[in-house]
């Protein structure tokens, strides 16, 4: 049966150390098999390393890195007639954050450093300087949207 009213997104509790909902969401994205305490120790260790390296406050450095990875446009497949077009669409703010976090975690997991905390710190450091695999992923998505700008009128 269809829902009659729009469901409210679940309220997420802010993380215990910095009091940031964004960081709590990031910890949840990193978490594997429900092991939140391990995910928290990885993230806090990475932020500690990041703040020592950049000289900025940990949360501020994290937000800069995330801002550099967030996509503004993406492509969605749309079938028109017999062919499928990659139609560029703007990304909603919540999805923007979710994609940015997911890309940072994926890029950190693919790195070859010793510990996950170090990998995450290096990826966040690269992202804050507009380089690294996560930023490259965003550039690829933007390039794809730019290349398919001609199909923007198929937007729905």
Curated annotation (Swiss-Prot):
Gene that encodes it: rpsG
Keywords (A to Z) from UniProt: Ribonucleoprotein, Ribosomal protein, RNA-binding, rRNA-binding, tRNA-binding
Family from the record: Belongs to the universal ribosomal protein uS7 family.
Name the UniProt record assigns to this protein: Small ribosomal subunit protein uS7
Job description of the protein: One of the primary rRNA binding proteins, it binds directly to 16S rRNA where it nucleates assembly of the head domain of the 30S subunit. Is located at the subunit interface close to the decoding center, probably blocks exit of the E-site tRNA.
Taxonomy, superkingdom: Bacteria
Source species: Histophilus somni (strain 2336) (Haemophilus somnus)
UniProt keyword annotation of Ribosomal protein present: yes
Entry GO terms, CC: small ribosomal subunit
Keyword Phosphoprotein (UniProt): no
PANTHER family from the UniProt entry: RIBOSOMAL PROTEIN S7
One family name in Pfam for this protein: Ribosomal_S7
Self-association and partners: Part of the 30S ribosomal subunit. Contacts proteins S9 and S11.
Molecular function per GO: rRNA binding; structural constituent of ribosome; tRNA binding
Annotated GO biological process: translation
SUPFAM superfamilies with a match to the protein in the record: Ribosomal protein S7
